[in-house]
């Protein structure tokens, strides 16, 4: 991805990995999920790769495959809005990674310690619940 190329070219990849390993809270949405995944199905690893997940890029198709749904997420009361745009999904979790949300049998949110990832874009909705969840992760270290 362009983001991974920039991280490498600017010499930031290893410092970011080190900061996450040292406990820096990080939240990756959509492409951020791809950057944090240790495995991407069918692709070599040139990413941050700090989270015990396997992701599938553009799993929901291209722009026309984008959609909105409300669904539950572990640790948040009620359903939350989820907007998917050319979104990946998590095919597999292992180690310390924990599934937080699924939509139609596909994993769309996960957590591993100080790392949170979602396949959807919470910034495109008015709900702040996922942001509050991330802040609670930081405050409850």
Regions found by a protein language model. Give the residues of each.
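Short glycine-rich anion-binding loops that position phosphate/pyrophosphate groups of nucleotides
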Residues: 1, 32, 123
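Flexible gly/pro-rich beta->alpha loop and the following alpha-helix that scaffold active-site loops
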Residues: 1-28, 36-39
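Short glycine-/acidic-enriched loop or helix-start segments at secondary-structure transitions
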Residues: 3-6, 36-39, 45, 94-95, ...
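A residue-level structural signature of the nucleotidyltransferase/glycosyltransferase Rossmann-like core
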Residues: 4, 25-26, 48, 82, ...
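A secondary-structure boundary/capping signal
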Residues: 29-31, 51, 86, 120
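Pocket-forming structural segment of enzyme catalytic cores
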Residues: 41-106
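C-terminal and late-domain segments of enzyme folds
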Residues: 66, 86-141
